[in-house]
Amino acid sequence: MEMKDFIFTSESVSEGHPDKVADQVSDAILDAILTQDPKSRVACETLVTTGMTVVAGEITTNAIVDYPKIVRETIKEIGYNDSAMGFDWETCAVLTSIDKQSPDIAQGVTEGEGLFKEQGAGDQGLMFGYACNETPELMPMSILLSHKLVKKLADVRKSGVLDFLRPDSKSQVSIQYINDRPVHVDTVVISSQHTPEVSYETIKEGIIEEVVKKIIPEELMDAKTRFLINPTGRFVIGGPMGDCGLTGRKIIVDSYGGHGAHGGGAFSGKDPSKVDRSAAYMGRYVAKNLVAAGLCEKCEVQVAYAIGVAEPVSVMVDTSGTGKIPSARIAQIVREVFDLRPRAIIEQLDLLRPIYKKTAAYGHFGRELPEFTWERTDKVSIIREKAGI
């Protein structure tokens, strides 16, 4: 059999990246609303640009929320605290344009209304979940390391270890795979915003020593590994001053870094009646439990819905030939073990809680935090029993 030898690349962005600022604002608003009224319907979009934040969307709720206060608190936590950056929490304008959810949509997702009496999906669409056994977190290594690099950048910035860093940054990790197993880090790219006066040499040395070498396992690097740190040579103008940021523009960063497929729907700013979010979380839960149970080495799950209809119109499982039993049988087990109706997903994963701001930076998947219920592997025993392994 021919040996498979290839390089796969994934990227991540920090909490200070303009698109991620927008995601975090949208999810901070969602959390504030769910705290008061868990049954709220929220579709909250955010735009950030030089000196301005715009919040718009369709929100039906009994909650009373101070939108500008939430926006400013979120921006402050991220670290935009100086008007010299062209965007800061104290002086930026905050504009809001909030309507209510369309009654035509509402009747399809409210139990007892619409053509079908169960709580239906909030929209049509297809969602994917993915897991693989190349890391303990059952995530692809390239996206996992990319997330950890930008999280470390934020940590050393906020702690003062590298006090010349500013909030906006990106990472990219290229990994050599041989026969589908990660064996070597080929290239690490990091671009981080910084203060104007610091030298390039200081930036490069600081990031390699305090970030890259603290995150990338030593055994995966050698003399051939390339480090490209701020490869333009200068990154002073950044954040919303450098680029306009929008909610939902980093869907591959949010999911699996290019591994597996993506249905196209973003997560942030959406309450869990929106299957773009809740069914994608459920897809991860299903795929992770299948891999953890040993049914396969990698797994992609697709689920699709029609608006207003509770039962998914299709469920597909693809193990890329790594399954110990046929994929059709695995899909049947998924149907038997997991209830994929929207209300059941919300109940199983306990999604009517203010947990979403934490998801909005450094990945929705692969972080085993208490709030991330979709990362649990509590279905392993019943899956193995049904599979007979």
Swiss-Prot record:
Subunit-level organization:
Homotetramer; dimer of dimers.
- Cysteines paired by S-S bonds: none
Keyword DNA-binding belongs to the record: no
Region named Flexible loop: 101-111
The record lists the catalysed reaction(s) as: L-methionine + ATP + H2O = S-adenosyl-L-methionine + phosphate + diphosphate
Q: Per its UniProt record, what CDD domains does this chain match?
A: S-AdoMet_synt
Enumerate the residues binding K(+): 45
A GO CC term attached to the entry: cytoplasm
Give a GO biological-process term: one-carbon metabolic process
Major location category of this protein: cytoplasm
Cofactor(s), by name: Mg(2+); K(+)
Give the protein name, as stated in the record. S-adenosylmethionine synthase
Positions binding ATP in this chain are 17, 168-170, 234-235, 243, 249-250, 266, 270
Gene encoding this chain?
metK
Its pathway is: Amino-acid biosynthesis; S-adenosyl-L-methionine biosynthesis; S-adenosyl-L-methionine from L-methionine: step 1/1
Q: Which GO terms describe its molecular function?
A: ATP binding; magnesium ion binding; methionine adenosyltransferase activity
| Origin species | Geotalea uraniireducens (strain Rf4)
What exactly does this protein do? Answer: Catalyzes the formation of S-adenosylmethionine (AdoMet) from methionine and ATP. The overall synthetic reaction is composed of two sequential steps, AdoMet formation and the subsequent tripolyphosphate hydrolysis which occurs prior to release of AdoMet from the enzyme.
Concerning Gene3D superfamilies, the annotation shows: 3.30.300.10
What keywords were assigned to this record? ATP-binding, Cytoplasm, Magnesium, Metal-binding, Nucleotide-binding, One-carbon metabolism, Potassium, Transferase
Top EC class of this enzyme? transferase
Q: Which Pfam families does the annotation name?
A: S-AdoMet_synt_C, S-AdoMet_synt_M, S-AdoMet_synt_N
Q: Where in the cell is it found?
A: Cytoplasm
Describe the family membership recorded for this protein in Swiss-Prot or TrEMBL. Answer: Belongs to the AdoMet synthase family.
> Which positions in this protein are listed as binding L-methionine?
58, 101, 243, 274
